[in-house]
Design a protein with these regions (language model features):
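Short amphipathic alpha-helical signal-transduction/dimerization elements
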Residues: 537, 589, 653-664
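Membrane-proximal periplasmic segments of bacterial cell-envelope enzymes
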Residues: 1-274, 278-299, 332, 339-340
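Solvent-exposed, polar/charged alpha-helical surfaces in well-ordered, non-transmembrane soluble domains
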Residues: 91-98, 102, 195, 199, ...
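Flexible, solvent-exposed loop/hinge segments and secondary-structure transition points
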Residues: 59, 205, 321-348, 356, ...
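Beta-lactam-recognizing serine transpeptidase/beta-lactamase-like catalytic domain environment
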Residues: 71, 77, 285-301, 310, ...
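Gram-negative outer-membrane assembly/targeting C-terminal domains
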Residues: 663-677
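Conserved, well-ordered alpha-helix/loop/beta-strand core segments that scaffold catalytic motifs
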Residues: 186, 291-339
Length: 677
C-alpha cells in the first residue's frame, strides 16, 4: 500500500479553511455591530460615558435709546448648596451649612437668605412673615402660624433637627439656608464669589457645595440705579404660584431653581425679554472622569437686547444737577434732604431721564447693602416713582385749564386780589404776597396769575369751578393715578370728598379752594408731574410714561418688540386755553426766573411751586417745558425741604440746555461677538 506523498499540503488546506471561516465570522460580527446595530451601540456607548448638563443662557443686555450699553455680562462663579448627597443625615447637612456660613462670614461674603426673620441674638419675624407664601410654608411643614418669633424658630430647629449645640443666632442662619432648600434639592447660595473663596471651597472640606459658572451683570454706568435695578437668586416665595393673588411663580414659568432673575427696576420689568433659553449638552468622560468631548443637543439662546427710552448722557446731567442743587442748599438739615427729577418726551410718554437723590452704585450694591439699609436718607427709595408730594402751585396750571375749558373764566377775565379771601366765614386764607409783604397782586387775568402764582385768584377760580370739575381734569392729566411706567409706581392722592370720606378725613368748602392751589390732600409723584406737563403742552394728549423703546434678539438680527401704544386719552384743549396758559408759563421765565432762564438755549415755559410740610418747612416743586413754541420735553423737579420752587430753576435750565445741545450720535449696541454664550 502506497503512502500519501503530500500529507502536509492537506493540513495546510484545512488550516486555511478554518482561517477563512474565522474571517467570514469576524466580518459578519463586525458588520452587525457597525452597520446593523451601529447607532444603537453608539448611543449605548455615549449613555454610559456621558452626562447631560444644562447650559445657562446669558442674560440679555440693556442699552439706552442711542445703543450705549448700560448693563452687560461677564463670567462669574456661584456657589450651589446641594442636599442630595447627605441623604437623611440632617446633622451632617446642618454642620456643612454652618461651616459654609462661617467661611462666608470670614470672607465678608453675603449669601441668599430670604427667611422673614431677623438675624442676631434675638431673631424676630419681619412683616414679610405675613405673606401668603410664608403662611403656606408654615402650614405645609406643620409649623405654628400664630406663634411668636421664638416659637417659630424653635419649631424650625426641631423640623430641621438643628441640635442644641448651636445658639439661636447660629440656628437662625442655618434654618435660613434650610428654608431656601425646602421643596428643592439645591439652591444658589451665593453669586459672583471671589477667586479667594473658590480656592477655599475647592480644598474638599465643604461637602455638598458645588461651583458653577454663570453670567454676572456688569454695570457700565454708575447712573440710573433706580431705573436699571438688580438681579438675584429666586426666593422661596417667588418660586411658588399663589392662586389667591394670581401670582405665577417661576416654577410654573419653566425656570430652573438656580436661575438668576430681575429683582427690581427694568431687570424685573423686562424679565421676559432678558431671560434667555437654556441649552443642553452631553459631556463625554473617560474612565478617570476627564472630559473628552461635548455635544450640544440644544444651543443656549441669550436673552434679548432691551433698548430703553433713557438718554444716558441726559441722565448724567439730571443726576448731577439734582445732586448739586440739593447739596448747595446749605443749612443744618441739608443732609436730610432728598429729591427727584423726571424728563418726558412730549407726544410719546418716553422717559428720557429720571433721577432720585440720594442714589447708590449698582456695581457695589451687594457690598454696600447693609449701609444702604441703615441710611436714614433712604437711598434705595425711588422718589421719582414712589415718593408723593403736594404739587403746590404747579397744580394751578390744571385749575387754569379746567376753568377756561368749562367757561368759568376766559383768558381776559379779571379778578382782583384783595389779599385775604373772605368768601367763607371760615377759612379765610391769605394770598402769599399779603402774608409776606402786606400787599396784593391787584387786578389780574389768568396768564398774569400764573406768573404771580396768585393764591387769591385761584381760591376764587377753584370755588367757581368746583372740586368735581377740578378732579375730572386732574384725572385726565393723569394726576393721582399710576403713570403706567413698567417698573411700577404709586398712584398718590387726588383730593376729593370721596377720598376724604374713605380715609376718615374731613372735607369742607375750604378743602376745595386749597385743592385748587395744589394743597389739601393732593399728593403726586415727580413722574406724574412731568407727565402732567407733557400732556398739557401737547394740547391734551395723555400718554403712559414708559421706559421700553424696543427689544431685539441678542445678535440684533430681528426685532422682538417695539413700544407702540397710542395716547390713553385726549383732553383736546382749545387753542385759546393753550395760548393763555403757556403764555403765563413763558412770561414767568422772563419775570422772577429771568436770572436762570437768561442762559437757556431755547425759549421755555415754567411754573414754580412750594408746599408746606411743617412749620416754616416747605418742599420745592418746579415744572418746565421746552421749546416754548414747539414743545419737545417736559420736566418736573421736587426737592424735600427745598423751599421755593424758584430755587430749582437753574437745574431745569441745565437739563434743557443738555438736551438741546446734544450731538445725538449715540453709540452702536454690542453685537453678538461681544456676548457670552
Amino acid at each position: 500500500m502506497m503512502k500519501n506523498p503530500h500529507p502536509s499540503r492537506r493540513r495546510v488546506y484545512v488550516l486555511l479553511g478554518f482561517f477563512c471561516a474565522f474571517l467570514v465570522l469576524f466580518f459578519a460580527v463586525l458588520y452587525d455591530a457597525q452597520v446593523v446595530h451601529g447607532s444603537e451601540n453608539r448611543a449605548r456607548s455615549i449613555t454610559s460615558n456621558t452626562a447631560s448638563e444644562t447650559v445657562t443662557a446669558s442674560r440679555g443686555i440693556i442699552t439706552d435709546r442711542n445703543g450705549k450699553v448700560l448693563v452687560s455680562n461677564r463670567l462669574a462663579y456661584t456657589l450651589v448648596v446641594d442636599k442630595s448627597s447627605f441623604g437623611k443625615d440632617e446633622a451632617a447637612l446642618n454642620d456643612a451649612i454652618w461651616q459654609l456660613i462661617q467661611l462666608c462670614q470670614e470672607q465678608g461674603v453675603t449669601w441668599n437668605d430670604t427667611l422673614p426673620m431677623t438675624t442676631g441674638s434675638s431673631p424676630q419675624l419681619t412683616s414679610k412673615s405675613l405673606t401668603e407664601s410664608f403662611r403656606e410654608y408654615l402650614d405645609d411643614n406643620k409649623l405654628p402660624t400664630d406663634g411668636g418669633s421664638a416659637e417659630v424658630l424653635a419649631a424650625m430647629r426641631k423640623l430641621y433637627k438643628v441640635d442644641d449645640s448651636y445658639t439661636d443666632a447660629q440656628a437662625r442662619l442655618i434654618v435660613g439656608v434650610r428654608y431656601e432648600l425646602d421643596g428643592r434639592s439645591s439652591y444658589t447660595f451665593a453669586e459672583d464669589v471671589s477667586t479667594e473663596l473658590l480656592g477655599r471651597i475647592t480644598d474638599g472640606k465643604y461637602r455638598g457645595v458645588t461651583i458653577k459658572t454663570a453670567a454676572a451683570r456688569v454695570y457700565n454706568t454708575k447712573l440710573a440705579a433706580h431705573i436699571l435695578g438688580t438681579v438675584g437668586a429666586i426666593w422661596q416665595e417667588e418660586w411658588r404660584s399663589d392662586e389667591s393673588t394670581g401670582y405665577v411663580g417661576y416654577a410654573d414659568k419653566g425656570y430652573n431653581m438656580n436661575d438668576l432673575v430681575g429683582k427690581d427696576g427694568v431687570e424685573k420689568a423686562f424679565e421676559e425679554y432678558l431671560h434667555g433659553n437654556d441649552g443642553k449638552r452631553l459631556i463625554t468622560t473617560d474612565e478617570n472622569g476627564k472630559i473628552t468631548g461635548e455635544l450640544y443637543t440644544r444651543e443656549p439662546q441669550p436673552g434679548g437686547t432691551v433698548a430703553l427710552t433713557i438718554d444716558i448722557d441726559l441722565q448724567q446731567v439730571v443726576e448731577d444737577t439734582l445732586a448739586s442743587t440739593i447739596q448747595g442748599m446749605i443749612d443744618k438739615d441739608s443732609n436730610e434732604r432728598g429729591g427727584a427729577a423726571a424728563v418726558i418726551q412730549v407726544g410719546t410718554g418716553e422717559v428720557l431721564a429720571m433721577a432720585s437723590y440720594p442714589t447708590y452704585d449698582l456695581e457695589t450694591f451687594n457690598q454696600d447693602y447693609d449701609e444702604l439699609v441703615k441710611d436714614e436718607r433712604l437711598p434705595m427709595f425711588n422718589r421719582a416713582t414712589q415718593g408723593v408730594y403736594a404739587p403746590g402751585s404747579t397744580f394751578k396750571l390744571c385749575t387754569s385749564v379746567a376753568a377756561l375749558e368749562e367757561g368759568i373764566i376766559t383768558p381776559s377775565t379779571i379778578i382782583e386780589d384783595k389779599g385775604i379771601y373772605t368768601y367763607y366765614v371760615d377759612p379765610q386764607p391769605m394770598c402769599w404776597i399779603w402774608r409776606q409783604a402786606h400787599t396784593t397782586h391787584g387786578r389780574i387775568n389768568v396768564s398774569q396769575a400764573i406768573v404771580d402764582s396768585c393764591n387769591y385768584f385761584y381760591y376764587e377760580v377753584g370755588r367757581l369751578t368746583g372740586i368735581k370739575k377740578l378732579d375730572e381734569y386732574a384725572t385726565a392729566f393723569g394726576l393721582g393715578q399710576s403713570t403706567g411706567i413698567e417698573i411700577g409706581d404709586v398712584s398718590g392722592v387726588l383730593a376729593s370728598p370721596e377720598w376724604a370720606e374713605g380715609h376718615d378725613r374731613e372735607w369742607t368748602d375750604g378743602q376745595t379752594i386749597t385743592a385748587a392751589i395744589g394743597q389739601s390732600y393732593n399728593l403726586f409723584t415727580p413722574l406724574q408731574l412731568a407727565n402732567y406737563v407733557a400732556t398739557l403742552v401737547s394740547g391734551g394728549e395723555h400718554y403712559e410714561a414708559h421706559l421700553l423703546k424696543n427689544v431685539k434678539s441678542y445678535d440684533n438680527s430681528r426685532v422682538i418688540d417695539v413700544y407702540g401704544k397710542g395716547p390713553l386719552n385726549d383732553l383736546n384743549i382749545s387753542d385759546s386755553t393753550m395760548a393763555a396758559v403757556t403764555k403765563g408759563m413763558h412770561d414767568l421765565t422772563y419775570d422772577s426766573l429771568r436770572s436762570a432762564f437768561s442762559r437757556c438755549v431755547v425759549e421755555a415755559g415754567a411754573k414754580t411751586g412750594s408746599a408746606q410740610v411743617g412749620t416754616d418747612i416747605a418742599n420745592g416743586t418746579f415744572v418746565a417745558y421746552a421749546p416754548y413754541d414747539d414743545p419737545e420735553i417736559a420736566i418736573a423737579i421736587v426737592v424735600e425741604k427745598g423751599g421755593s420752587g424758584s430755587l430749582l430753576a437753574n437745574a431745569a435750565v441745565d437739563i434743557i440746555n443738555a438736551w438741546f445741545t446734544r450731538d445725538g450720535t449715540g453709540a452702536t449696541a454690542a453685537g453678538e461677538d461681544a456676548l457670552m454664550r
